[in-house]
């Protein structure tokens, strides 16, 4: 379990292991159910329990005047611990109601057969299971080649012996069939055996417990599913077809916001289905970029380290390691993201190594190459110990020998502001006019936001970032909470863990701290990069109680909960003069509900962990409220039987970020300080994080610092576009 304790003015949590258990492993004892039928015994009850209704998600639209829409509840999110009833069968998918299970079973049997997908004229099919599956149902995506050579994607939902198939144009989430997710799985116990209604249930091996899911409360009417399929443009589809169907060695690029990441995700999914995940090497030039796409660094995958040895030495090193040798020989496709930061000399070495290791004189030893990135952004890092001059990848011999297609994407999605797009293109090519320079200077103005969330500041150096965040955090009143990560990593891999993750080892927060989300939440509108503000710190059980008392979370509720959180596990403080004065200062109409929560809070164990409750801004006057509990941040190390993982709350202070860490991010509110710019491409990377000029502030702009490499400009003039 996670244990909360206070020291002076700081509150911390740390992980305490008992019998090898993790936070998700703890669960309350189970209650026996009175079963009426055999089917309901195995399939669970049909009615929602009171506990389940507590976890329902509330949605509101602050702009709407319709009172009838203010209390809409979405399906409850099961909490995997603190459940007083057995979760072994109570949440099974496909369960029958207790009232008339035979009638429900007859409905299922009488359902007409579905033929909603086009039959394939070929025998070739590629299938891969999705991650969101439960024991009672399985979701799969299958790709078929039709007669017109078009790659079709079919999603199949299997439940025991029944199977439903949908084409990719059907929104599965809107259908009557409810797909199970990881959060709907019963909580697994690490005990070797248990009893339920007289049945002895045995577990043959220890099962890794599931991590707790967040207790959420959503106040937004525009709830969109993060799992809905992405529709590619014609330009993007042609890039995908060149790679997947025609097996072409491709480099594709484009300015910031042209959908390079969307194409990459699609390619990875389809190639993994076609060849199997083991045959696809997913790499990037940096640890942060590698984690984002679910891969590893190019240096780690290839096994050559920094690559400063001779080719003979590197080949010998690879041949001496069986796993490394197998990876080189059985890889069919090598994907490299952020290719602009890879030195061309390194690619030349890798190409020769590939041909020698695979004993194949084809380009790159017969491995298909998929390269992506933007050479107008951050360039390769020069190494002081190398005599060779750093060169761009497109200047390497490997590029001339291997790359068949170089494609420039032209459609911009991130910025819908045409004037901002013109400014970014001018900076990108280093062709500033007097009017554009004047427009950028006019962006040096303050911007007020109604929700109080300040714009994220970007700086060129890490020290500027640290000073800004520390200064703003110290200026806030109240207690400081420190959340220390639990790392699962051998000592020799600790540096990899630190450099590959945006989530910090120690996260220090206060009430009103401004934070950024570091995980995607598929069940709400939260995405990696969302901005929010910490409202208060509470336990999970107190959040459930709060939702019973208050239907929505407004400013008055925030004031109430900040008062309540002070007395969690501390009955003596409740009787103090200072607390009594603060309590009596609250409106009289709120005192009755406040006393209920206070009496509940003082009975909570002082050892129960408190977590930040955050208000996230997801649109104009639209918010999501979420209790941020620790989550896992895994890192895959190729060929290493090591599970690197950091467990930490998915937050970081975001008053300020470095330009380097911001690369690849979309930031809704941006304040850029260009005072210490030192590298070509930094200004472009910084400003291209913005979405619109209305939310962009630029300080210390100097046209003389806009530098573009002429070799990069010449290269981009020769790129092919797909219309």
UniProtKB/Swiss-Prot annotation:
<protein>
    <recommendedName>
        <fullName>ATP-dependent DNA helicase RRM3</fullName>
        <ecNumber>5.6.2.3</ecNumber>
    </recommendedName>
</protein>
<keyword id="KW-0547">Nucleotide-binding</keyword>
<feature type="modified residue" description="Phosphoserine">
    <location>
        <position position="64"/>
    </location>
</feature>
<dbReference type="GO" id="GO:0003697">
    <property type="term" value="F:single-stranded DNA binding"/>
</dbReference>
<feature type="DNA-binding region">
    <location>
        <begin position="682"/>
        <end position="701"/>
    </location>
</feature>
<dbReference type="GO" id="GO:0071932">
    <property type="term" value="P:replication fork reversal"/>
</dbReference>
<dbReference type="InterPro" id="IPR027417">
    <property type="entry name" value="P-loop_NTPase"/>
</dbReference>
<dbReference type="GO" id="GO:0019237">
    <property type="term" value="F:centromeric DNA binding"/>
</dbReference>
<dbReference type="GO" id="GO:0016887">
    <property type="term" value="F:ATP hydrolysis activity"/>
</dbReference>
<dbReference type="GO" id="GO:0006260">
    <property type="term" value="P:DNA replication"/>
</dbReference>
<keyword id="KW-0378">Hydrolase</keyword>
<dbReference type="Pfam" id="PF05970">
    <property type="entry name" value="PIF1"/>
</dbReference>
<dbReference type="InterPro" id="IPR051055">
    <property type="entry name" value="PIF1_helicase"/>
</dbReference>
<dbReference type="InterPro" id="IPR003593">
    <property type="entry name" value="AAA+_ATPase"/>
</dbReference>
<comment type="subunit">
    <text>Interacts with DEF1 and POL30.</text>
</comment>
<dbReference type="GO" id="GO:0043139">
    <property type="term" value="F:5'-3' DNA helicase activity"/>
</dbReference>
<keyword id="KW-0413">Isomerase</keyword>
<feature type="binding site">
    <location>
        <begin position="254"/>
        <end position="261"/>
    </location>
    <ligand>
        <name>ATP</name>
    </ligand>
</feature>
<feature type="compositionally biased region" description="Low complexity">
    <location>
        <begin position="83"/>
        <end position="96"/>
    </location>
</feature>
<comment type="similarity">
    <text>Belongs to the helicase family.</text>
</comment>
<dbReference type="GO" id="GO:0051880">
    <property type="term" value="F:G-quadruplex DNA binding"/>
</dbReference>
<dbReference type="InterPro" id="IPR010285">
    <property type="entry name" value="DNA_helicase_pif1-like_DEAD"/>
</dbReference>
<keyword id="KW-0347">Helicase</keyword>
<dbReference type="GO" id="GO:0005739">
    <property type="term" value="C:mitochondrion"/>
</dbReference>
<keyword id="KW-0158">Chromosome</keyword>
<keyword id="KW-0779">Telomere</keyword>
<dbReference type="GO" id="GO:0006281">
    <property type="term" value="P:DNA repair"/>
</dbReference>
<keyword id="KW-0234">DNA repair</keyword>
<keyword id="KW-0539">Nucleus</keyword>
<dbReference type="InterPro" id="IPR048293">
    <property type="entry name" value="PIF1_RRM3_pfh1"/>
</dbReference>
<keyword id="KW-0067">ATP-binding</keyword>
<dbReference type="GO" id="GO:0043596">
    <property type="term" value="C:nuclear replication fork"/>
</dbReference>
<comment type="function">
    <text>5' to 3' DNA replicative helicase recruited to paused replisomes to promote fork progression throughout nonhistone protein-DNA complexes, naturally occurring impediments that are encountered in each S phase where replication forks pauses. Needed for normal fork progression through over 1000 discrete sites scattered throughout the genome, like rDNA, tRNA genes, centromeres, active replication origins, or transcriptional silencers. Required for timely replication of the telomere and subtelomeric DNA and for wild-type levels of telomeric silencing.</text>
</comment>
<keyword id="KW-0597">Phosphoprotein</keyword>
<dbReference type="GO" id="GO:0000781">
    <property type="term" value="C:chromosome, telomeric region"/>
</dbReference>
<feature type="region of interest" description="Disordered">
    <location>
        <begin position="1"/>
        <end position="31"/>
    </location>
</feature>
<dbReference type="GO" id="GO:0005524">
    <property type="term" value="F:ATP binding"/>
</dbReference>
<dbReference type="GO" id="GO:0000723">
    <property type="term" value="P:telomere maintenance"/>
</dbReference>
<dbReference type="InterPro" id="IPR028880">
    <property type="entry name" value="Rrm3"/>
</dbReference>
<dbReference type="GO" id="GO:0097046">
    <property type="term" value="P:replication fork progression beyond termination site"/>
</dbReference>
<dbReference type="GO" id="GO:0000002">
    <property type="term" value="P:mitochondrial genome maintenance"/>
</dbReference>
<dbReference type="GO" id="GO:0005657">
    <property type="term" value="C:replication fork"/>
</dbReference>
């Amino acid at each position: 379990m996670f244990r909360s304790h206070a020291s002076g003015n700081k509150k911390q949590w740390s992980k305490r292991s008992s019998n090898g258990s993790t936070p998700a492993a703890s669960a309350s004892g189970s209650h026996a159910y009175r079963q009426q039928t055999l089917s309901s015994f195995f399939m669970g009850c049909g009615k929602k329990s009171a506990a389940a209704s507590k976890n329902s998600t509330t949605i509101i639209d602050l702009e709407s005047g319709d009172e009838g829409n203010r209390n809409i509840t979405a399906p409850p999110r099961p909490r995997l611990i603190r459940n007083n009833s057995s979760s072994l069968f109570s949440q099974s998918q496909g369960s029958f109601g207790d009232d008339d299970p035979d009638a429900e079973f007859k409905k299922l049997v009488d359902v007409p057969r579905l033929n909603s997908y086009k039959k394939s004229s070929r025998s070739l099919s590629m299938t891969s299971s999705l991650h969101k599956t439960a024991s009672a149902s399985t979701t799969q995506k299958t790709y078929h080649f039709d007669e017109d050579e078009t790659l079709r994607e079919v999603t199949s939902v299997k439940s025991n012996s029944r199977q439903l198939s949908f084409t990719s144009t059907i929104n599965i989430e809107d259908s009557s069939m409810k797909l199970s997710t990881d959060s709907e799985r019963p909580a697994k116990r690490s005990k070797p055996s248990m009893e339920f209604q007289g049945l002895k249930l045995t577990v043959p091996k220890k099962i890794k417990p599931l991590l707790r899911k967040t207790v959420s409360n959503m106040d937004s009417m525009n709830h969109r599913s993060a799992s809905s399929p992405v529709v590619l443009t014609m330009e993007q589809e042609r890039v995908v077809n060149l790679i997947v169907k025609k097996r072409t060695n491709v480099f594709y690029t484009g300015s910031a916001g042209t959908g390079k990441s969307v194409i990459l995700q699609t390619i990875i999914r389809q190639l993994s289905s076609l060849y199997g995940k083991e045959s696809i090497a997913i790499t990037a030039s940096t640890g942060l970029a590698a984690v984002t796409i679910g891969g590893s660094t190019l240096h780690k995958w290839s096994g050559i380290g920094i690559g400063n040895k001779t080719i003979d030495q590197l080949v010998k090193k690879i041949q001496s390691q069986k796993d490394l040798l197998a990876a080189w020989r059985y890889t069919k496709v090598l994907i490299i993201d952020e290719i602009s930061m890879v030195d061309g000399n390194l690619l030349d070495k890798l190409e020769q190594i590939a041909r020698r290791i695979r004993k194949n004189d084809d380009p790159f030893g017969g491995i298909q190459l998929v390269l992506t990135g933007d050479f107008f952004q951050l360039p390769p890092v020069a190494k002081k110990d190398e005599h060779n001059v750093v060169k761009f990848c497109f200047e390497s011999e490997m590029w001339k020998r291997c790359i068949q297609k170089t494609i420039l994407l032209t459609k911009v999605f991130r910025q819908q502001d045409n004037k901002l797009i013109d400014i970014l293109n001018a900076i990108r090519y280093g062709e500033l006019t007097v009017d554009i320079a004047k427009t950028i200077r006019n962006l040096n103005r303050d911007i007020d936001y109604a929700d109080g969330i300040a714009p994220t500041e970007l700086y060129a150096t890490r020290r500027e970032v640290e000073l800004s965040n520390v200064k703003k955090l110290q200026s806030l009143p109240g207690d400081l909470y420190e959340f220390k990560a639990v790392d699962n990593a051998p000592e020799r891999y600790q540096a990899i863990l630190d450099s590959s993750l945006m989530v910090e080892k120690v996260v220090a927060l206060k009430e009103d701290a401004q934070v950024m989300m570091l995980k995607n939440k598929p069940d709400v509108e939260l995405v990696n990069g969302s901005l929010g503000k910490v409202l208060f710190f509470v336990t999970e059980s107190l959040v459930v109680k709060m939702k019973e008392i208050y239907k929505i979370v407004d400013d008055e509720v925030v004031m109430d909960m900040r008062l309540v959180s002070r007395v969690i596990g501390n009955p003596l403080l409740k009787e103090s003069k200072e607390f009594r004065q603060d309590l009596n200062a609250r409106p009289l109409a709120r005192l009755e509900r406040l006393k209920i929560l206070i009496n509940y809070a003082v009975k909570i164990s002082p050892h129960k962990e408190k977590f930040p409750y955050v208000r996230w801004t997801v649109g104009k006057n639209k918010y999501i409220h979420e209790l941020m509990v620790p989550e896992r941040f895994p890192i895959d190390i190729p060929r290493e039987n090591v599970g690197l993982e950091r467990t930490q709350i998915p937050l970081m202070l975001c008053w300020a970020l470095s330009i380097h860490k911001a690369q690849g991010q979309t930031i809704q509110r941006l304040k850029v300080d260009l005072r210490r710019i030192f590298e070509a491409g930094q200004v472009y990377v910084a400003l291209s994080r913005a979405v619109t000029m209305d939310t962009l502030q630029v300080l210390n702009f100097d046209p003389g610092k806009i530098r573009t490499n002429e070799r990069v400009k010449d290269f981009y003039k020769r790129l092919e576009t797909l219309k």
